[in-house]
């Protein structure tokens, strides 16, 4: 099975549920140490993905700007499970995600309390991995009862 076939069968819901179940098991088995391991793993995963994105941008002769961070994203929601819009361009580029397939998957399976750890760490570390000089301010996230995922670059 090639990467595309795997991606078609293992989509957002499967990723979300797998992540949340790992967090749940680590908390139940190891308490705070399990929680810390999940945080550290999510940070490392985000930074590694960000670095891969940066390498592709640099290979193409592009700079590591916030714009190119968005253009070189590794993950595309082909099925449109999430809804993200540009909220503002100035003074800062801001996006609002008003419906999140990850969050909805965690809710569907009763795993929101475990999955929301992902939201606390992944995006900031994707940005840091892409370019440590870029800053992402996360003002709210759906999985933590925010009105939307409010990201300001």
What are these regions (language model features)?
Residues 1-93, 101-118, 129, 134-148:
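N-terminal accessory segment detector
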């Amino acid at each position: 099975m090639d990467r595309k076939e795997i991606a078609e069968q293992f989509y957002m819901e499967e990723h979300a549920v797998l992540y949340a179940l790992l967090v749940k098991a680590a908390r139940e088995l190891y308490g705070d140490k399990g929680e810390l391991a999940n945080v550290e793993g999510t940070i490392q995963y985000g930074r590694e993905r960000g670095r891969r994105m940066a390498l592709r941008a640099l290979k193409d002769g592009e700079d590591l700007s916030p714009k190119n961070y968005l253009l070189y994203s590794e993950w595309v929601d082909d099925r449109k499970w999430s809804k993200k819009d540009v909220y503002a361009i100035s003074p800062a580029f801001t996006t609002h995600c008003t419906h999140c397939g990850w969050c909805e998957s965690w809710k569907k399976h009763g795993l929101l309390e475990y999955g929301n750890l992902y939201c606390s760490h992944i995006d900031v570390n994707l940005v840091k991995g892409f370019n440590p000089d870029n800053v992402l301010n996360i003002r709210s996230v759906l999985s933590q009862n925010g009105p939307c995922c409010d990201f300001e670059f």
